[in-house]
């Protein structure tokens, strides 16, 4: 993962950047902050689906800075009364997603397949993730604007999908281009991940709607259409 190779940059962006934002929120009396956290804060926890009250044990510097950011947000809320929603996003995917960062596996696969290049899978492909469509994430963010107090909410489908299953979804839209190579597991990678979305449904009344196969189809076709 990028943060393992660039811990200084990860800290500068995720922590120093957040503090700059929060200080200006305090200064200009901003009433509400919505924060993009990550499933990475949970670490390699086998209690799937993971709920928001579990102990956090991140395995990457990215997860550490996201966890620390949540504490900064909580204290700013307690000191200055800023309404805050911490969204712990599962693996978000969708049209126009970049190929960088910690969670862009779908867009990376799109880029490689569209270019006729082999896809590299780190590990045996049985590691799982919770893939949530960007449109469903947008619905959660919109609903979060009205939230009061301090809330921590997973944004997820609550469904485990292995990387091999993800490749199966890609095979349905780009079977003639799909070539897979397996490599050693990367340091800091999590083996299983799926997040409970009970709180998302209860507090924000949002239920993710997009099915993975349809979402992959939309994302890949958009990628090819735009000639990326």
Predicted regions and their residues:
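N-terminal Rossmann-like NAD(P)+-binding domain of SDR-like oxidoreductases, especially those catalyzing
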Residues: 1-92, 206, 222
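Conserved donor sugar-nucleotide recognition element shared by glycan-biosynthetic enzymes
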Residues: 61, 69, 102, 163, ...
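Hydrophobic alpha-helix immediately C-terminal to the catalytic Tyr-X-X-X-Lys motif of short-chain
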Residues: 68, 72, 76, 109, ...
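Residues at the N-terminus of a long alpha-helix
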Residues: 57, 99, 130-133
């Amino acid at each position: 993962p990028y943060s393992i190779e660039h811990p200084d940059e990860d800290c500068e962006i995720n922590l120093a950047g957040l503090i700059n934002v929060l200080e200006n929120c305090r200064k200009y009396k901003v009433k509400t902050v919505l924060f993009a956290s990550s499933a990475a804060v949970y670490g390699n926890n086998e209690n799937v689906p993971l709920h928001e009250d579990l102990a956090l044990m991140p395995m990457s510097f990215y997860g550490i800075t996201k966890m620390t950011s949540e504490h900064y947000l909580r204290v700013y809320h307690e000191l200055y009364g800023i309404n805050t929603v911490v969204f712990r996003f599962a693996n978000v995917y969708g049209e126009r997603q970049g190929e960088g960062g910690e969670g862009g596996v779908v867009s990376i696969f799109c880029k490689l397949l569209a270019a006729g290049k082999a896809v590299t899978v780190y590990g045996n492909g049985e590691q799982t993730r919770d893939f949530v469509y960007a449109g469903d994430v947008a619905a959660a963010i919109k609903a979060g604007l009205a939230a009061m107090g301090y809330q921590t909410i997973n944004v997820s489908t609550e469904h485990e999908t292995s990387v091999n299953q993800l490749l199966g979804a890609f095979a349905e839209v780009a079977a003639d281009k799909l070539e897979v190579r397996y490599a050693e597991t990367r340091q800091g990678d999590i083996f299983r991940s799926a997040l409970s979305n009970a709180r998302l449904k209860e507090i924000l009344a949002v239920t993710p709607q997009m099915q993975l196969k349809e979402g992959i189809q939309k994302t890949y076709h958009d990628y090819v259409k735009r000639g990326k």
